[in-house]
Amino acid sequence: MAAVSLSVSTVKPLGDRVFVKVSESEEKTAGGILLPDTAKEKPQVGEVVQVGPGKANEDGSRQAPEVGVGDKVLYSKYAGTDIKLGSDEYVLLSEKDILAVVN
């Protein structure tokens, strides 16, 4: 089996899937207490870095995605598949799991 080298540019989401770079979680509380990794909340905000071609309709056409590369999005807490590339964390999720575009 050949080794596969993954990078953001080599990940191409299929269908209505979206590849999102996860925003950094808070390192400490408002009171200044440092949080260990096990106590940090899983972030639910990130930036879209790749978008699939859209959901396939019954007639074979595609429904264009509502989000695009560069959009900052809020997504469901337990949605998608977590992927780590280097020191960065990403999540691959269905467009339906995106709750809002954040300005």
Curated annotation (Swiss-Prot):
Task: Write one Gene Ontology MF term.
Answer: metal ion binding
The record's section on CDD domains has: cpn10 (cd00320)
Task: Name a single GO biological process.
Answer: chaperone cofactor-dependent protein refolding
| Record keyword Coiled coil present | no
So which domain of life are we looking at?
Bacteria
UniProt KW keywords = Chaperone, Cytoplasm
SUPFAM superfamilies the UniProt entry points to: GroES-like
Fetch the Pfam families from UniProt: Cpn10
Protein task: Together with the chaperonin GroEL, plays an essential role in assisting protein folding. The GroEL-GroES system forms a nano-cage that allows encapsulation of the non-native substrate proteins and provides a physical environment optimized to promote and accelerate protein folding. GroES binds to the apical surface of the GroEL ring, thereby capping the opening of the GroEL channel.
What does the sequence similarity comment in the record state about its family?
Belongs to the GroES chaperonin family.
Q: What is this protein called?
A: Co-chaperonin GroES
UniProt source species: Synechococcus sp. (strain WH7803)
